């Protein structure tokens, strides 16, 4: 392959492989809850405490008296890595959270469970919102949108990459 894509940058082991990263887009990581959940904003500190297992009930963040069902991504996920770096900031994830392997799974579980919370790429919320009953909550009172990600205002965002090895072929450059 001439080009590889990734939702994360190179880790320490990969930096010695001679790969050149090319930023192709900026992506927001949307925090999603069930449409019926009245909570519409969470701070990064509240998110950290939810994913660390310190906040366990929605009433602690202005919602109903309902247990929070924490949905996490698997360790191979670039989305999880970005969320861990930006939101968790060195705080470990609670080992009791459900770990799912894909965006669709996270979205489906959150749409079926009134108390669930998850995180997915912003593009999947907007493109599939009509067929699922999830909503993206604001983070630090900033709405998750293409505009706020592009402006740098939305706090949970990352770069998306293409990687090439050495000098890219003409086909790769045209792509």
PLM regions and their residue ranges:
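Exported/periplasmic ABC-transporter solute-binding proteins
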Residues: 1-175
């Amino acid at each position: 392959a001439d080009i590889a894509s990734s939702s994360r940058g190179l880790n320490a082991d990969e930096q010695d492989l001679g790969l050149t990263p090319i930023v192709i887009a900026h992506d927001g990581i949307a925090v999603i809850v069930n449409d019926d959940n009245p909570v519409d904003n969470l701070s990064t500190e509240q998110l950290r405490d939810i994913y660390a297992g310190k906040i366990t009930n929605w009433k602690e963040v202005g919602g109903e008296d309902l247990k929070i069902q924490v949905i996490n991504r698997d360790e191979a996920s670039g989305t999880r890595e970005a969320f861990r770096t930006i939101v968790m900031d060195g705080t470990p994830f609670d080992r009791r959270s459900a770990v799912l392997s894909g965006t669709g799974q996270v979205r489906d579980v959150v749409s079926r469970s009134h108390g669930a919370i998850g995180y997915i790429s912003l593009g999947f919320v907007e493109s599939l919102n009509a067929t699922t009953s999830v909503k993206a909550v604001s983070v630090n009172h900033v709405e998750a949108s293409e505009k706020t990600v592009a402006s740098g205002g939305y706090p949970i965002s990352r770069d998306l990459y293409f990687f090439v090895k050495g000098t890219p072929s003409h086909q790769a450059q045209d792509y």
